[in-house]
Amino acid sequence: MASQTAVTARSAYRQILRATRIAFQDDFRVLVAARQEARRQFDEHRREGIDTPMQINHAKEVAAILRHNIVQGVRDSNDENGKWELRIHDDIERGDNDSIRVGGKKVKVDKPCSA
């Protein structure tokens, strides 16, 4: 029977794989590179140690950033102006720009983007 840490680590790894699939959907080269890097990082930290919970938490945070904050752009080769088309999917975090509207006043941040 697998330990709870191993189960949590596998779950975090699967979260990263799903997040890379969403973030790099039409970019096979970057998708493969991101997955290889994730595999390399998990292989480097294969043995359970004191910092294992921190490593698992880091993996979950990476997955969240990939899923919610990475937007890829594709340059339109037919357009002489070189316009870019952004691939914004349903999981992308969209801000409301309230801090821009404040205009010189101090802005209180209630929570970080990853929360």
From Swiss-Prot:
Entry's localization field: Mitochondrion matrix
Its primary localisation, in coarse terms, equals mitochondrion
Q: Which UniProt keywords apply?
A: Chaperone, Mitochondrion, Transit peptide
Q: Name one GO cellular component term.
A: mitochondrial matrix
Q: Which domain of life is it from?
A: Eukaryota
Key word Membrane present in the record? no
Chain intervals for the UniProt region annotation (Disordered) = 95-115
Could you mention a single GO BP entry for this protein? Answer: mitochondrial respiratory chain complex III assembly
Return the InterPro entries for the record.
Answer: Complex1_LYR_LYRM7 (IPR045298), MZM1/LYRM7 (IPR050435)
Give one GO term, molecular function aspect: protein folding chaperone
- Transit peptide, start-end: 1-36
Family statement drawn from the similarity comment of this UniProt entry: Belongs to the complex I LYR family. MZM1 subfamily.
Q: Which function does this protein serve?
A: Assembly factor required for Rieske Fe-S protein RIP1 incorporation into the cytochrome b-c1 (CIII) complex. Functions as a chaperone, binding to this subunit within the mitochondrial matrix and stabilizing it prior to its translocation and insertion into the late CIII dimeric intermediate within the mitochondrial inner membrane. Modulates the mitochondrial matrix zinc pool.
On assembly, the entry states: Interacts with RIP1.
What protein name does the entry list? Mitochondrial zinc maintenance protein 1, mitochondrial
Q: What is the lineage of its organism?
A: Eukaryota, Fungi, Dikarya, Ascomycota, Pezizomycotina
